[in-house]
Regions:
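Short amphipathic alpha-helix that is part of the acyltransferase structural core
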Residues: 12, 42-99
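Conserved beta-hairpin
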Residues: 106-122
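A conserved beta-turn-beta hairpin within the catalytic core of GNAT-like acetyltransferases
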Residues: 126-127
Length: 127
């Protein structure tokens, strides 16, 4: 992984950390941030060639993937991300935390749907 990619990850993580840097954050959103931060500390990253992603049988088409640009999609994004945790309480705290997201052009959120169900979520940046 090159420096530019690592810097993009750092910027994304700083942006996510600052979501609850407000005057009166909720106890739940702060707990959600702590849970999310612990996960980041255990996270490892690897570069995946774009061609590897495109060569796989594609489950979603471009028409199935939506830019998160209003609150309901933010909630769906948060719920999908929370499913990375097995503990129900942690999932609830992650939803509370991530629904605080203030949309930014630097980090775009996407939600993918299959047969009317939200099945994928991503944070995308152009580094």
């Amino acid at each position: 992984m090159n420096e530019q990619q690592l810097e993009s990850i750092k910027r994304k993580n700083a942006w996510l950390h600052d979501l609850v840097e407000v005057e009166f954050p909720t106890k739940e959103s702060l707990e959600g941030r702590a849970i999310y931060t612990r996960m980041l500390e255990e996270q490892s990253y690897q570069v995946v060639e774009k061609s590897l992603l495109l060569d796989k049988e594609q489950r979603l088409t471009a028409e199935d993937i939506f830019l998160v640009d209003f609150h309901r999609l933010t909630v769906m994004f948060s719920i999908l991300q929370s499913q990375r945790w097995s503990d129900k309480h942690e999932q609830e705290m992650i939803v509370e935390y991530l629904t605080q997201i203030i949309l930014s052009p630097e980090f775009e959120l996407y939600v993918g749907f299959a047969e009317g169900e939200a099945v994928g979520a991503a944070i995308v940046s152009q580094y």
